[in-house]
UniProtKB/Swiss-Prot annotation:
GO cellular component terms, semicolon-separated: cytoplasm
The family this protein is said to belong to: Belongs to the MurCDEF family.
Biological source species: Rhizobium meliloti (strain 1021) (Ensifer meliloti)
Localization in the cell: Cytoplasm
Main location: cytoplasm
Pathway(s) it belongs to: Cell wall biogenesis; peptidoglycan biosynthesis
GO molecular function, one term: tetrahydrofolylpolyglutamate synthase activity
The name this protein goes by in its record: UDP-N-acetylmuramoylalanine--D-glutamate ligase
Keyword Cell cycle: yes
Pfam family, one: Mur_ligase_M
Amino acid sequence: MIPVTSFKGRKVALFGLGGSGLATAQALVSGGADVVAWDDNPDSVAKAAAAGIATADLRGADWHAFAAFVLSPGVPLTHPKPHWSVDLAHQAGVEIIGDVELFVRERRKHAPDCPFIAITGTNGKSTTTALIAHILRTSGRDTQLGGNIGTAVLTLDPPKAGRFYVVECSSYQIDLAPTLDPTAGILLNLTPDHLDRHGTMQHYADIKERLVAGSGTAVVGVDDSLSSLIADRVERAGTKVVRISRRHPLAEGIYAEGSALMRAQDGASSLFTDLAGIQTLRGGHNAQNAAAAIAACLAVGISGKDIVDGLRSFPGLKHRMQPVAKKGEVVFVNDSKATNAEAAAPALSSYDRIYWIAGGLPKEGGITSLAPFFPKIVKAYLIGEAAPSFAATLGEAVPYEISGTLEKAVAHAAADAARDSQGPAAVMLSPACASFDQYKNFEVRGDAFVGHVAALEGVSMLI
């Protein structure tokens, strides 16, 4: 745990005790703060109280007594409308911050020179975060991995000289971290997502920009127009910018040519490494993730050899284009993390004959943007609330069935793929949807897919 000493002896309000919220409360108490915590969920309040955290309904609190208000990232700060606790904090003039901001202040106070890499973007954050941490660890660095990837940042070991931090940041966390100042900050890409919480695409982009604007070195993917403009703006403001691209050559930066990653500097380009044969980094999207990891690791002093060794030994992440089983020439791929169309595109681009399981709780725009990949899809198996709208989009372009459930979709897709005599094929869960209509989260959905695949006759599991 990182004891938060910045508010020692002062009173701090905290709202949101699920997920990282309880860990944040404990870190504040450990650092000597007088914490008053609350949540709209009585079970979360009871759990915090049982853990020794002082709880009280903040509606009745004297807000002028608080030095800060710590808000969990899952609680609305601005859209669709501010949570009632946010309104009370504003009325009292109390600063509103989150757990990443508390981490940033502790690092600055106790070990400002320890390298800190922060990663954001609409898609690819977790893979890039895990890849960077893997490279650092295999190169022998003391590495702490946390943030939005699943480990609350304040549960990590405390900052000290020589310790590296790799932190995935959601837009919600950045919005609550006004002094975010990583050694290297990464913005991978920007596509419409979470607009229910940010109102407009421009507001969403403005929040993401803060992470790289405060960085020592800003690593920015320039394959979308908003991110490209951000790179230009941040560079004009005086920050060192390393541009990355999976789509086109760059005069300066790191870019992909097929599976080859090129490094352009001082007017010349040279091969940095080739990802061919690294199954866990298959596809153009992973070329971008690897390019970002290379740029960030170079920025914090890791050698080219150590970076390449780390890339080659990367084990990959669950639920992200994860090959989980084989049966003959059919591979079963768990890409449950693809919760929107943009995130599903990389998997669809990486295989040639696909039996596609898709659907769930639909996101804005549906799957119309995936039309270029429809020729690769032998048949689609549609599940969840999105099934009728996805069927309408597929129309006559792709054969489909409305399977309804994941179990039925897996069984039917596997049977159809087994009869495919035209070469290697993939039965792929890449839903292009959120999971919440049928599953608690994408992890549970992915695990269910793996379970249904494992129950099939004659499959060889790869995990």
